[in-house]
Amino acid sequence: NDTDPDRELYPEYAGDWWLVNSMIKESQLFFADLVVNNRPASGLIDSDYTFLDERLARHYGVDGLQGPVFKRTKLPQESPYGGILTQASVLKVTANGTVTSPVLRGVYVLERLLGYHPSPPPPSVPAVEPDIRGAATIRELLAKHREDPSCASCHAKIDPPGFALESFDVMGRWRDNYRSLGEGSKRIAGLGRSGNEFVHYIGSAVDSSGRMYKGEAFDGINEFKKLLLQDKEVIARNLVHQL
């Protein structure tokens, strides 16, 4: 699977099928609850509850659940989770297992949640390849990419949602720093879940701030959600089109 976590960078996830299955189940239960109980479409962006079992609760940093049975769980007030937008299943499939991609995640938010479809990139423009050695951040690489006038207008819309989600790793867990295979402030080595030896480094701090294409600034996922929720009609209309 192209989105399975890299065993060098994320050895703690190797073979964790309980987590993977729980991620899928959460999304199924949450969306069914949204539709069956006629809850507002804004719940796709943010909600004060989700459905968790012990493994997924631990992944999200939520205490108090034991065992494999899913329960409707109220999230802590300042939790970055809540809504489809920040569910681990979505965050996993919008990464490639090695690095997160603000572009993939940004396009997902625009297309699936807001109903806006960015134009495909010009064939002459190469894709942005993240630097897993840690020498340059994805934000720096995208800034250089936007210097091309043919890329700037679309990336002004795509990049901000992706930046807001950068505080979540390739499996949707909260992080404060990137990991790299080459450079960083701290070397981490050991044996992974599958018994493989690994070495990686704690890299630069994550920056999840940004500015929407209309000019509104945000610092982190919760402020970004509030900006999206200023236009609930767009979210509701797009949900109807998706069903």
Residue map of PLM features:
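Active-site substrate-binding loop specific to GH73 endo-beta-N-acetylglucosaminidase modules
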Residues: N1-H241
